[in-house]
Amino acid sequence: MNSHSEPTSLDPRLISDIPSVTTAKILFDGLCRMTEQGATPSLALKIEVSEDKKCYSFHLKKSLWSNGEPITAHDFEYSWKSILDPNFPAQYAHQLFILKNGALAKMGAVPTSGVGVRALADDLLVVELEHPSNYFLELTAFPLCYPVNRQTDENNPEWANCDGKSFVCSGPFNLIQWRKGADVVVQKNPLYWESEVVQLDQITLSFIEDEHTELNMYENGELDWAGSPNSSIPPEALPELQQRANTELFVLPIAGTYCYKFNTKVAPFHSQKIRQAFAYAIDRKILIDNILQAHQIAAQALIPPCVVANHQDLPNAKGLAEAKALFEQACTEEGWNQESFPPVTLIFSRSEKHHKMAQAVQQQWNEAFGIKVALQSYEWNTFVQKLNQRDYQVGGRGWVSDLSDPLALLEIYKQTNDAPSGGGNDTHWHNKSFARLLEEAKRCPDPTRRTLLLNEAETILMEQMPIAPLYHSTACYLKKSYVKGVYLSKLCDLDFKYAYFDD
């Protein structure tokens, strides 16, 4: 299959994008693993939950690392506490703030020894939470929570960037090689605890950025899977692919939203009215109907409908009239005219789809405001680095929720990237009321009240507009008819554990 981009890391604690998540699920395993039944025990043999739902006891299966060493509760304790070390650069560390003292440890206010995760024996892990959580078991199935081999990590901090011989993992497949700029090759792990169900002998994940090249390779039989969740199919090819008899094209809604992000500390986007104007001036229907063509849904807010049914209606595309009025008001307040308006550059990851979409938005902004907008594309890792370093004005990026809970997407914007927790908020935007509402929702036992709190938080986000949601995503992919048993969820969990070829 094509992975489109190299994973940012093969260390599951450092995942930050979908290619990294896909690769981590191939190479590692966790206490639970996502299946069609939800979070299902994997390395955990038995799970006990306290009456107050704040303490979980995980009894572990007898399982082995790929180097033959036993996987123990101590590996889990070490891995989770290392993520919460203030000096460890885990972008998703905020997900572990649900652990007792997790947030305080990441801020350096308490030592990691005070975090609520303890190995009471090699096969017993006890976890204490800050508050009850309906999604905690689902979180243990997310690659961030997969353990790493403590001895390997302590002896060789570069183990995740080494060749296959030095790489130690726990999942259905072993790493054979990682050829930078080319591919990752894995083979069946004979020491995996459930190796008897793994039927594929080898998987090659290629790094092909050009969508047409990927499609041609699929059509020529060089790929068995093309497109989502790691890559995309050229939009102009979709109508013909959909009309084929016995089509191998599949489309399903996923818990993701593609947004244009604004750097709120850089002119002109320090102005809330400018951010609103630019967001309202985008005709999302044109983007979906003429460019994307994969049944995406115009985004009225951040949270996708497949995460929350009958979600609140927060229209952010209020039309050109309001966009122009806000633009004029902001220019008057800032003292800008046509000549002095700050130059604007829109950046995006290198793909034909993103380029065409950026060109369409560029034209819409020019027609609405009479300004010129420059476009700049980057290969994936460079693009992510530009966003993380806040070296941009407007940048397009999609996010897929880690969990089946609206809180997961909203929490991205709770703190800025320079906070110890990281979290992916590279807009410089921070709002105390927004953060307070999310914190209250986390601890709220009443589902109705919790929904109201999250809706109120999302309303603030959409009024302040550090992001302009464009569309709710779909997974659009090609799969050979003989490929069976692959699991792809609305969270873009792509799992080849049970995959096989039916010749």
Language model segments and positions:
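Alpha-helical secondary-structure segments
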Residues: T72-S79, D122-E128, G171-P172, L200-Q202, ...
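Append "and occasionally in soluble cytosolic enzymes with long acidic Gly/Pro-rich linkers
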Residues: K188, H270-Q363, E367, A374, ...
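Long beta-strand-rich cores associated with HINT superfamily self-processing modules
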Residues: S421, Y477-D503
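Aromatic- and charge-enriched surface segment that lines or borders ligand/interaction sites
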Residues: K46-Y92, V126, M217, P268
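Extracytoplasmic/peripheral linker and loop segments enriched in polar/acidic and small residues
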Residues: R118, D289, I371-F383, N388, ...
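Gly/Pro-rich hinge or "lid" segments in bacterial periplasmic/extracellular proteins
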Residues: Q37, T112-S113, R118, D123, ...
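N-terminal lobe/hinge region of extracytoplasmic solute-binding protein
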Residues: N2-E51, V168-C169
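Extracellular/periplasmic solute-recognition and catalytic clefts
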Residues: I176-V185, T204-V266, D289
